Amino acid sequence: MIKMKENNGITLIALVITIVVLLILAGVSIAMLTGNNGILTQAKKAKQETSDSAQKEKEDLIKLEMIANNSNVNIPNLKEGMIPVKWNATNKTWEVADKSNTGNDWYDYSTESKKWANVVTVKENCSNGKTRADYLSAGVGTPIPEDDITTMFVWIPRYSYYVKSGYHENANGTGEFAIKFLIGTSDKIIDSSEGQDTAIRTSNTNGKTNGGKYVVHPAFTADTDLGGTGDELSGIWVGKFESSNYTSEYNNKNISTSTTDEDILYGCGDNKNVTIRPNVTSWRYITVDDILKVSQNISKDEAKIYGFKSSELTTTMMQNSQWGAVAYLAQSEYGNMPKIDDGESGIWNNSYNEGITFGSNNSYRMDNRSVTLTGMSGSSRDSATSYYSKVVDGSKKDNGDSIEITYTNINENATTGDNYTNIFYRYYTENGQKASTTRNIYGIYDMSGGSWEYMANYLGSSIENTFVSNFLKIEPKYQTQYAGTGATSSTEDRTLNYEANKGKYGDAIWETSNGCNGQCAWNVDYSNFPYASNPFFIRGGNYSDGSVAGLFSFYSNNGWSYNYRSFRVVLF
């Protein structure tokens, strides 16, 4: 077999030159070759038309595939080891769904259903003698026990948006996004009923996203300066719950008021393998360096926990842009959008905390060892459990669908105060589903309350911070720097940094707030911008933050481990 070698390029160039020379010798003028109607110009035009035709054909094929799958969004990109699932409310269990989505069995991103696509991974050896292979080949409707699940992810399809109301304001219950889903990895709008068939980039809008024109959300783009991944994506998979450790037990069975092992209390477990599950304590007390490491180790799957094929996917810690991609979809007609400031609508807080409290050298208050539980909801939207409180021994009552806990307040002089009781609801209950981004079981949980979540975003100028120095060496697709030289926590310095990043969009910061030092974000969420000694972003609030926790909450931290800092994993 004859192989073409490196000199092929030279041969082709020589051939083109030869043809041009022959044409000139034959009396064909340069103008006839290069003019508007010249041979070369027409050849370029034909090449472009062929390329455009091929792109259109590709888009048409994707649309046909969507129609075949009853889908108005990009078909979820299933990776090896992923099992599509649906919820059986009668049996309170996840079941294998039809991956061809017949009858919208798996997902339906309509404004009525708000049924976002969910997948699970399972253990290699599961309960009842089953294996991972059994579930991967199981028929539609096969139940998957929660104990067998190692991760749960939710599909966020590629979309475009503009800020319909509340742009750069402190919009309390009135901020809203208009959303249009896109075809494949293109900027073509699936439903162009509003007269715009192609979404734009902000370079065409003077950086504004409130002009009534749909803009491609940067989380799905190759623009790493705005939180893209270096590739154009048809969508991303987002952890359904805050991350946890593989060894953490369901319902905190190994935790009581007498527990002193901090690896158990903080959900660190063996400090190795990540899971994404409901009804376990989230993994806290972990630095940003280690978050990035354990998140990326998921795709390697060295412990055979997930069934992934490392060569076909990437897993990493979440960035602001990806948080924004979830938040914007949630704050639209496709998600759990608050209509008014009524105390009922919107995403309810996960205010669960078992409040293991110990004596402190600081006589002001006692030290709290917060113990969370993923996917829970309080009894009201803005519910909170005081950070300075402890569980009354023996008061925790697991009622199946809910958990009731009585606490004792800790006074400022470290003496005990009054008792109070909170009720928390499982993620699948009526109240529990209010804590989801869709207000049903198919959304994403723990984005309001639970634990603050570290993002892979930071002030790039804070090179004296060890973690910033480390992150500066990481590939751009895994992290995004923010500008700003403000060094202190003063309003002036925070504002300086906030203003320096007004060109960023899609990250649920500038577009969804009018300030950075208080409660200036949408829905009166926290808004405190990073500064030199606290250069990293954290999002969402924690169990004790009440009304200021939420989708649009952002705060600063130094990257170190704390007992109320967790993280979330993204897969693409």
What are these regions (language model features)?
Residues 75-157, 161-164, 315:
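GGW-centered surface loops in extracellular recognition modules
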Residues 38-71:
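Membrane-proximal N-terminal amphipathic helix
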Residues 143-151, 189-447:
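Short aromatic-cysteine micro-motif
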Residues 1-10:
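N-terminal leader/signal peptides at the extreme start of proteins
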Residues 10-19:
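N-terminal signal-anchor/signal peptide hydrophobic helix marking the start
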